[in-house]
From Swiss-Prot:
This is ATP synthase gamma chain. SUPFAM superfamilies: ATP synthase (F1-ATPase), gamma subunit. F-type ATPases have 2 components, CF(1) - the catalytic core - and CF(0) - the membrane proton channel. CF(1) has five subunits: alpha(3), beta(3), gamma(1), delta(1), epsilon(1). CF(0) has three main subunits: a, b and c. Produces ATP from ADP in the presence of a proton gradient across the membrane. The gamma chain is believed to be important in regulating ATPase activity and the flow of protons through the CF(0) complex. One of its GO terms (molecular function) is proton-transporting ATP synthase activity, rotational mechanism. GO terms for cellular component: plasma membrane; proton-transporting ATP synthase complex. The lineage of its organism: Bacteria, Bacillati, Bacillota, Bacilli, Bacillales. Pfam families: ATP-synt. It is a peripheral membrane protein. Belongs to the ATPase gamma chain family.
Amino acid sequence: MASLRDIKAKINSTKKTSQITKAMEMVSASKLNRAEQNAKSFVPYMEKIQEVVASIAQGSKGINHPMLNSRPVKRTGYIVITSDRGLAGGYNSNVLRTVSNVIRERHNMDSNQYSIIVLGRLGRDYLKRRGFNIIDEVVGLSDHPSFTDIKDIASRAIAMFADGAYDELYIYYNHYVSKISQEVTENKILPLTDVASDKPTTAYEFEPSEEEILKVLLPQYAESLVYGALLDGKASEHAARMTAMKSATDNAMEVIDSLTLSFNRARQAAITQEITEIVGGVAALE
C-alpha cells in the first residue's frame, strides 16, 4: 500500500496537471471564438466569387479553360490539412487515417499514381514515416492564418494541375460542425466541374471579356477553396483541443478525488494503528 507521502505527492502532481490542462482549455476556447469568426467572415467572399464563376460557366457554352475541363485521370493530387501541435484528441489521427486508407485503396501506394501536399508538422511527420509520396509541405502556419500565408502553396498546387503533374486535386480536412463535433471531409478542388451556385445567378457584363476574366478568377476561386478549408480546419483544431483538454481536466479531478479518498483512508488507518498501539502499551503497563 502506498504511503501517505506518496499519495500526497500524487495528489499535488495531478493538481498541477489539471491546472495546466484547464489553462490550455481556456486558451483553445479563446482561439476557437476567433477562428469561428474568421471562417464565417470568409463565406460571403467565397459565395460571391462562386456566383460570378457560375454566371460565366453557365451562361457561356463556348468558354474553354483547363481548370474547367476533365481529363483522363492518371495521377491524383491530395492536399491534407493537419496541425503543427498535438493534444487535440482525434483531430489529426482521423484525417490521416482516412487519407492513408484512400491512397492504399485507390493507388495501392504506387507513388506514380498520386502526390501529397501536406499542411502541418504532425501530418508531414506521420506520412513521411510511412513512406507516402509528399511533394510539398507547409509548417508553422499561425492559429489564425491570412490568405497570404496560404497563397503560395495554393498557387503551386494549381500550377501543378495546369502543368499536368496530376489530373485531379482533392483536399482533406476536418470540417467544423460544432464545438464537440468535427467531420473528416473530402472536397474536389480541380478540375472545377461543379461551380453551380445554389442562388439565382446574376447577369454581369464582363470587360474585357469573359475568357480574360476567367483566367484571373478561376485560380482565385480555387485558392479560396483551399483557404476556406484551412479556416474551417483551424476552427476544428481549436475545438478538438478545447474538448480534449476539458476531458483531461475532468479526468484529473476524478483522479484527485480518488487519491484524496485513498489518502483519508490511509491516514485513518494510521491513526487507528497508533491508537491501538498506545492502548496496547497502556494495558501492558497495568
